[in-house]
Curated annotation (Swiss-Prot):
CC terms in the record's Gene Ontology section: cytosol
Main location: cytoplasm
Protein name (database record): Leucine--tRNA ligase
Enzyme Commission number, as recorded: 6.1.1.4
Enzyme class: ligase
This protein's encoding gene: leuS
Database matches in InterPro entries: aa-tRNA-synth_I_CS, aa-tRNA-synth_Ia, Leu-tRNA-ligase, Leu_tRNA-synth_edit, M/V/L/I-tRNA-synth_anticd-bd, Rossmann-like_a/b/a_fold, tRNAsynth_Ia_anticodon-bd, Val/Leu/Ile-tRNA-synth_edit
Example GO BP: leucyl-tRNA aminoacylation
SUPFAM superfamilies, per database record: Anticodon-binding domain of a subclass of class I aminoacyl-tRNA synthetases (SSF47323), Nucleotidylyl transferase (SSF52374), ValRS/IleRS/LeuRS editing domain (SSF50677)
Annotated catalysed reactions: tRNA(Leu) + L-leucine + ATP = L-leucyl-tRNA(Leu) + AMP + diphosphate
UniProt similarity note: Belongs to the class-I aminoacyl-tRNA synthetase family.
Length: 887
């Protein structure tokens, strides 16, 4: 063996051996040495977007997965760790626009680069199952299932209000609208109502909610972080209340009553119905449009609202504005006339696009009424409180403590009883009923983008929107388009666009919208189970592997991706494609990787960021960083604290640079040791150096003791006291490390390995066979415990030192068992105190009773020394810990 630890040579040789053996390919028929089927375990990281290069967040995520996979394989399980590419999406279009290349080319090059980096990391990935969502063989099944959803009524075509960029001629996501303007063009964004396809996720809302909110639910996701369950519960947002109508006699231009003469609202606070002093409708509401036809000021206001946000989050932060319409509706219980306003805070997509205004008991309505001089009427009262129009108080909206007042038939009723009474009263008039609503909205999947799954629909003037026949799937996306910023290039591709109608044969056109990329990531984990099946979307492999046992990914995916994947699984179940109710049994959301941020203002008012290696920190007297200066010229820069690694802030670390300098094992070891997986990891160059030094020590011990380790026998009964002590330490560490693997607390797995190496290095070999045997056993435990984190160096040492000859390749070597007999001590050491102060220690037989311990303490030299001739008054024994001699 080479005395010097050479990561590049070691890792290259290990890779070659694993590739030649196809070491990570798994199937559904794996059996143990007795011919029994191995239990399965499916561990998967969220598939990455092929952005160009891996970042340290990727390294951390995949190393967590790899450690889990390798250790469970050693424990005899059939473990699947697949990988793929979330390859469609807007970033590829933007890169293509910038570089004048097709997104396909940019994407494939990035996949090749990132796959090479993953190989260099030594990940135990079954690459035979690799998928890329931009492959027609993959997205064919997006299209196929979409057609099945159409047949089942789960998918349907309807209109939607979207953010429209009039310059780029495309729909923008809400996060792409900055201060009302398109993020790229700078144009004022418009709200437009355009047709698109929606998936009825709300149909599954109760089931989706139960598994995250109700521990009694048979599908309750107890293996998920509570934080994620709560985020999904809030996003689904179940509300129970009353939907009722304000009748009116407002007729449209056609002479018919608008919306049948009923303005419907939904409220969870029907107990406050007697406090209604106005109603507000969305700018797109039919009553708003009717009033605006003869009111130029209102028409201008509605046009202004068209440049606002389209989400609840945006509306919550913007200034609340409104204008009266001059229209009135009738209060369903009092018969009073209630004025209708147009409010910029009302969403047409939420409920009926209208809300009742109760300023006395809703904080938003209170501010709106004060701003516009609308009357405020108190209708609930909490005991001991005083209502005032001067300002809002939290109790005004408290439904738990208050009872109805100034409300006629409702007076004195608490919240629940009042709501039931209102539902009864409006129901008797045929104007309403109790209803459950959801914050969750049906999933609009249409995107006016090129780089995505084509929606398999053909539009015919005679036949309407016609599904593409299954035999013609996939509808293949042209891969040579180069976006030029003038809208969806598919609209210009006549070879794609023009097609015969499947029904009548007349000229027709394909749908040019593509699917939301969340569609791609909603079922890829099932495709891994049967990735090469050209005849079926999923088959037997899915029955074997699903549900996934462990899913690993960032908290940023807690809502949309995970919710959509759960929904997609339930749809596939209902269509008879899979048998599971929930896709992911356990979820780990790993923490972000953080690093220091340094910057300063430029002469032009911009911000210039500096790499951490370019600066030197300035500390205060307490050792706290107060600033920094450039190493090159000593000029001051601002220290921005710790933040997420980012290319834009020059505080990222290129994993490839780390691998080139230290090797993949060092990179893996550091990201596992520096922090528990679910917590943030603060980057530390000194920590990387420390991890590398530790691996050099592991290597050095193996080299130094090579001959002894190769020639040692199995541990027998004849061991010296020191050998027994070392063996006990080995098995204590093994017990703790095994437990830490079960908990996925990989940082303490590494610290346990460090503790074990310290013990092995400190041990003085006495030349006996027993001593050598304990060293050999201890080092084998070290290599196996460390192997999932650092597979290359441990693989090499395992083979070179003869372990593989007896126990097989480290990939499938058995996980070591704790020998309980080794934990039994012949002798124990107790802390010795005199009058409560520690003065030394004593050793006594492990089986010593209280009298024997007291005798040993009384006879010790330390007691004689510190008692100073005084007689012993009392001895206090704390079993297994200490003895206190009171003089």
């Amino acid at each position: 063996m080479n005395e010097k630890y050479d990561p590049a040579a070691i890792e290259s040789a290990a890779h070659a051996q694993w590739v030649a053996a196809d070491a990570y390919r798994v199937d559904e028929n794996a059996r143990d040495s007795q011919g029994q089927l191995k239990p399965k375990f499916y561990a998967c990281s969220m598939l990455p977007y092929p952005s160009g290069k891996l970042h340290m967040g990727h390294v951390r995520n995949y190393t967590i997965n790899d450690m889990l996979t390798r250790q469970l394989r050693m424990k005899g399980m059939n473990v699947l760790m697949p990988m793929g590419w979330d390859a469609f999406g807007l970033p590829a279009e933007n890169a293509a626009l910038k570089n004048s290349v097709p997104p396909e080319k940019w994407t494939r090059e990035n996949i090749a680069t990132m796959k090479g980096q993953m190989l260099a990391m030594g990940l135990a990935i079954d690459w035979s199952r690799e998928v890329a969502t931009c492959d027609p063989t993959y997205y064919k099944w997006n299209q196929w299932l979409f057609l099945k959803m159409l047949e089942a009524g789960i998918a349907e075509r309807r209109t939607q209000v979207v953010n429209w960029d009039p310059v780029d001629q495309t729909v923008l996501a809400n996060e792409q609208v900055i201060d009302g303007r398109g993020w790229r063009s700078g144009a004022l964004v418009e709200k437009r109502e355009i047709p698109g396809y929606y998936l009825n996720i709300v149909k599954y809302a109760d089931e989706l909610l139960g598994a995250v909110a109700n521990p009694e639910d048979p599908n309750y996701l107890s293996g998920w972080p509570e934080r994620v369950r709560l985020m999904q519960e809030n996003w689904i947002g179940k509300s129970e209340g009353v939907r009722f109508a304000f009748p009116h006699q407002i007729a449209g231009a056609d002479g018919e009553l608008i919306q049948g003469g009923k303005l419907y609202v939904f409220t969870t606070r029907a107990d406050t119905i007697m406090g209604v002093t106005f109603c507000a409708v969305a700018p797109e509401h039919p009553l708003a449009a009717h009033a605006a036809a003869t009111n130029p000021a209102l028409a201008a206001f509605i046009a202004e609202c068209a440049h606002g946000g389209t989400t609840e989050a945006e509306l919550a932060t913007q200034e609340k504005k409104g204008l009266p319409t001059g229209l009135f509706v009738t209060h369903p219980l009092t018969g009073a006339q209630v004025e209708v306003w147009v409010g910029n805070y009302v969403l047409m997509s939420y409920g009926d696009g209208a809300v009742m205004g109760v300023p006395a008991h809703d904080e938003r309505d209170f501010a709106f009424a004060k701003k516009y001089g609308i009357s405020i009427r108190q209708v609930v009262q909490a005991e001991g409180q005083t209502f005032s129009l001067d300002g809002w108080a939290d109790w005004y909206g408290d439904k738990q403590r208050a009872v109805c007042v100034n409300s006629g038939l409702l007076d004195g009723l608490p919240y629940k009883e009042a709501v039931s009474k209102v539902a009864e009263l409006v129901g008797a008039q045929g104007l309403g009923e109790k209803k459950t609503t959801w914050r969750l909205r049906d999933w609009g999947i249409s995107r006016q983008r090129y780089w995505g799954t084509p929606i398999p629909i053909i539009h015919c003037d005679d036949c309407g929107s016609v599904p593409v026949p299954e035999k013609d799937l996939p509808v293949v996306l042209p891969i040579d388009c180069v976006p030029d910023g003038s809208g969806n290039p598919l609209k210009k591709r006549t070879d794609f666009l023009n097609v015969a109608c499947p029904c009548c044969g007349k000229p027709a056109q394909r749908e040019t919208d593509t699917m939301d990329t969340f569609v791609d990531s909603s079922w890829y984990f099932m495709r891994y189970c049967d990735a090469r099946n050209s005849e079926q979307m999923v088959a037997g492999g899915t029955d074997y592997w699903m549900p996934m046992d462990q899913y690993i990914g960032g908290i940023e995916h807690a809502i949309l991706h995970l919710l959509y994947a759960r929904f997609w699984t339930k749809v596939m179940r209902d269509l008879g494609l899979v048998k599971v109710n929930e896709p992911f049994t356990k979820l780990l959301t790993q923490g972000m990787v953080l690093n220091h941020i340094y910057s300063r203002r430029t002469d032009k008012g911009g911000i210039e960021y500096f790499w951490p290696h370019e600066v030197e920190n300035v500390f205060d007297a307490g050792g706290k960083v107060t600033g920094a200066k450039l190493k090159s010229d000593g000029s001051a820069v601002d220290y921005g604290g710790i933040g997420t690694m980012s290319k834009s802030k020059n505080n990222g670390v290129d994993p490839q640079d780390l691998i080139n300098q230290y090797g993949a094992d060092t990179a893996r070891l550091f990201v596992m040791f520096a922090s528990p997986p679910e917590q943030t990891l603060e980057w530390n160059d000194a920590g990387v150096e420390g991890a590398h030094r530790f691996l050099k020590r592991v290597w050095g011990f193996g080299v130094k003791q090579a001959e002894l380790l190769k020639g040692a026998t199995e541990v027998g009964a004849e061991l010296s006291g020191d050998a027994k002590a070392l063996r006990r330490e080995v098995h204590l560490v093994l017990r703790q490390v095994s437990y830490d693997y079960e908990r996925m607390q990989y940082n303490t797995v590494v610290s346990g390995s460090m503790k074990l190496l310290n013990a092995l290095e400190a041990y003085k070999h006495d030349g006996s066979a027993g001593s050598a045997a304990v060293l050999r056993e201890g080092y084998s435990v070290l290599l196996r415990g460390l192997y999932p984190a650092c597979p290359h160096i441990t693989h090499h040492l395992w083979s070179e030192l003869g372990y593989a000859a007896k126990l097989g390749d480290l990939l499938d070597a058995p996980w070591p068992e704790v020998v309980e007999a080794a934990l039994v001590q012949d002798e124990i050491e107790l802390v010795l105190q005199v009058n409560g102060k520690t003065r030394g220690s004593i050793k006594v037989p492990a089986a010593a009773d209280k009298a024997a311990i007291e005798a040993a303490a009384a006879a010790s030299a330390e007691v004689a020394k510190f008692a100073d001739g005084k007689p012993i008054r009392k001895l206090i024994v704390v079993p297994g810990r200490l003895v206190n001699v009171v003089v």
